[in-house]
């Protein structure tokens, strides 16, 4: 028995000043999931009709907690690598010659393998390939050199060969002693110089690097050398302001020794977040609302008032017939408690979430429930002035219910003088003839509800987030006041509550007036807590901007639809009574409150990167119209989304809005100028700048069709042949003479194909030893090396595909220009046992495709030129230096408990 009593006492929690039972406990992420479920029910009603005529969409409710964890993981990722040696960017292919080798720029070799093959009729694949190639540039160049291997040579510090970025060890065994000594002398000259960057000692040396990679490296190094000191000061100063607003002390533990001379620090993200970046996303109002709930809303309990309040006012008689007395002992169901959650969500997000009444025939037939809801609804909600918690329909229904309650004479009969209009509450009641018209809803002035004659929105000291400067003051309560629940609310009142008491007394409802008079302290504590939650915890970049907030009520009244329409949730009549008898009491602050700014910064940074990607991709159709004939803006939108982090996509698509974003939404967002500065954005913009030359992406439109005989040299002098390092490639040193080039557009080839003369026309051009260029379409280029004769599909491959078929007595032809093009290098080898005609065939072999790229991808060099590519300045940080990413310091902090919790 004692154990049962102990378990019962554990289940029933009470506050020091209230003896009501604790009903449930809700945290921010849990409430966000609940809110998302309820919002999705409303959103689906609108979307369902549209989706019945289109494709099916997965409407499962996402896991908000998992999304937040993924974003935190995203914040921990580094966009740069710390390495000891850079990547090998130049390699050498050994030929039979002792003084000549082939030098290969490995950047172009690797870039040729990135992405899919481009075709004319798959624009989304083209966009995706471009993004992959740009990300490849950014990834290869985002490195920081630290603790590079060095050696001592005659008192000088010299870089080890692997640091230089040139691979030549495979060449050394075939060189003469003289050549090896020459290379060794050049290596001994790779002296490490001592430099000073941002008051830090560094090593400076000359290495080899491809131009696109070096641009990214140089931009990253410039970002570090710029120190970002002012940005850090701004971020920390802003965090202190935010901590003052949210009662959070931000720890500077991570920042205590970062200014030491042995520390190099990097700040990859910045604060404050630009709110325009977050709110410019198309159809994002619901997603931002859910993120605001999940990251900021505290964990709380729904607590009932002291039961003695109702026992000494409403149920003091043995026989009770009044509506309030009837409902006093009622117990809420699970669905009704869910409605209570909706009501408090609507109170915490005024204007963004508004309430309407469920169509429930059972409750509409119960007059007691409706009457009680009509009274408490006027004391719970705000309807007009600056914002509203209700729809116009619900406000009118509450007016009708209050009208019925005042005219319900169950104790004594009072005098009523009816007005001429027949509107709800158009009468005067009681001995003093109280005019009840003042309690009829007026959204323009807020009369009849909590906003009546009250300043419930004010602007005072500047808020940390510039877009949300408003302070909500339900019942005129200032959120800066400290709440002592044992005494707070005593002697406090506001206009609507006073008028309600006056009207109840005038109507002869003395017991109910006494009940509300006793409930006033509990009621004021309720709204004081809500004010604190709204103005402190819920203040974030996901808060609705002031201009949108101020437009919500006028747009609702006018029936205008804007970017941030309110979400309407349905509640039952009786849930208003249960909500009035429960107060949301915060017990624990949100676990993510101190890291919310970092989450916001990561999200805004990723959005900015996506916007930059889409801006550049939107220009592609104008730059390369031949390869994007069927392209639409939705194609590059999908391509960017597919290559974006899953967590960011999940946040953007919390309400499944991506299925309904149109081209207008998309292009408007792309063209808006707002961006969130970050290291990732800086490197992404530099990568796009490097990719403006599409040949650096191994894409080219300079592909020609020309019949050329594969060389078959005679081996009269094998030794001389081997020393020359003979090779053949279909890569042109320069474009062909323009007067010998025939430009084949799509119109020309269609005309000739329709006449059945396409192949004959090309054959005539080839016989005249001329060149054909097929349109200006971009093609994917691959680089391959062969020690023997390449396969026939490479040698005789054509720079187009031409297929014909016959169907129904008609001939059809399909022509595609965008095909994969291969640049091949055939290295000739000869043995001393070969005869002079060993490489000669009876019938010649022809190659049909020639490519011109204005880049030195492969070149034959002499041994003395192996290290000629060492022309880039590199900065390396010494091994005893620490490279410290202080981005995580932007989330270190300790939540302060509310003074009275």
From Swiss-Prot:
Gene Ontology molecular function terms on file: structural molecule activity
Record-level GO cellular component terms: virion component
A Pfam family it matches: Orbi_VP3
Tagged with keyword Coiled coil: no
SUPFAM superfamilies linked: Reovirus inner layer core protein p3 (SSF56831)
Subcellular localization: Virion
Keywords associated with the record: Virion
Similarity comment: Belongs to the orbivirus VP3 family.
Protein purpose: The VP3 protein is one of the five proteins (with VP1, VP4, VP6 and VP7) which form the inner capsid of the virus.
UniProt-recorded name of the protein: Core protein VP3
